[in-house]
Amino acid sequence: MLMSTLPGGVILVFILVGLACIAIISTIIYRKWQARQRGLQRF
């Protein structure tokens, strides 16, 4: 019942916030992976 009362803009905002969170988490994981790769190259 809540979905019928919500306007389309609110759903778009939720989708954009979710994509932003996924992008931030993926960049953090990518930076940690890069640091790990550099650490392996040193040894």
UniProtKB/Swiss-Prot annotation:
Cell compartments where the protein resides: Cell membrane
Pfam family, one: PMP1_2
Keywords for the protein's UniProt record, in alphabetical order: Cell membrane, Membrane, Transmembrane, Transmembrane helix
Annotated GO CC locations: cell periphery; fungal-type vacuole membrane; membrane; plasma membrane
TM segment ranges: 9-29
RNA-binding in keyword set: no
Disulphide-bridged cysteine pairs: none
GO molecular function term, any single one: enzyme regulator activity
Propeptide intervals in chain numbering: 1-5
Topology, Cytoplasmic side: 30-43
Leftover remarks: Present with 74700 molecules/cell in log phase SD medium.
Subunit details: Monomer and homodimer. Associated with the 100 kDa subunit of the plasma membrane H(+)-ATPase.
Name of this chain's protein: Plasma membrane ATPase proteolipid 2
